[in-house]
Amino acid sequence: VNEAIRTAYEQKGVAVVICPNDLLTEKIKDTTNKPVDTSRPTVVSPKYKDIKKAVKLINKSKKPVMLIGVGAKHAKDELREFIEMAKIPVIHSLPAKTILPDDHPYSIGNLGKIGTKTSYQTMQEADLLIMVGTNYPYVDYLPKKNIKAIQIDTNPKNIGHRFNINVGIVGDSKIALHQLTENIKHVAERPFLNKTLERKAVWDKWMEQDKNNNSKPLRPERLMASINKFIKDDAVISADVGTATVWSTRYLNLGVNNKFIISSWLGTMGCGLPGAIASKIAYPNRQAIAIAGDGAFQMVM
């Protein structure tokens, strides 16, 4: 169990302990070595030569797009400064929903089967992809054509794992984005961004029409709009698997101080309510909200 816990922390994911059915009924002597607290440097500084290579690609690009993941969650300020300097639209992976506020003008939503049309169109028309803190697994939604790409990640194994990368930056995203901002050219106007924001405005209009649909029976989109009115700025949202994921992702407008918890690609149905309970234990002074369908709710009751 101790090894599983260490592995989960080191790999930033789920560790599973599998036991034979009859083992848990047996009595054994406790011969397990006591765990030793260990520490290792958590901040990896990128190589400056890689930063310079990335700067050249960014300055040359006419149609850049950025895809961010949870590896950028501690670099919110640096991310915002970079994209506003370079005028780059940002797409987020589903677990990274609150890294950039949903109402930031350059945020165009998430990518994938339940992503926005704007994100997919922008991704396919881009001439440069910048991936930050993500090992995005759904490669069918990445650019179909062979474009230039930059990837920032603390784990060198993730560099080029999903997409052909021209410049890999192994390092902390907070440091890397700050260094990129200090070295890139300031962009006053980017036609590609303007075109993207025009598409985003159309998408947002569609979403508003859904949320204002007063037909009966009550539409889930309208329910999400009502819930959104009562969500506090630092609330924790625990979204379950299924259509509840679609509703909460598309129709909840969240900010950088919110937490958005999902099962992601694990698809663990029934995670919504336990996630909200755990959130209230971890953050007793914060609002915790579970978004779950009837099936997911019944699975844990």
Where are these regions (language model features)?
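Glycine-rich, acidic loop regions that bind phosphate or pyrophosphate groups
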Residues: 1, 96-195, 291
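Structural signature of the thiamine diphosphate
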Residues: 1-33, 57, 120-148, 179, ...
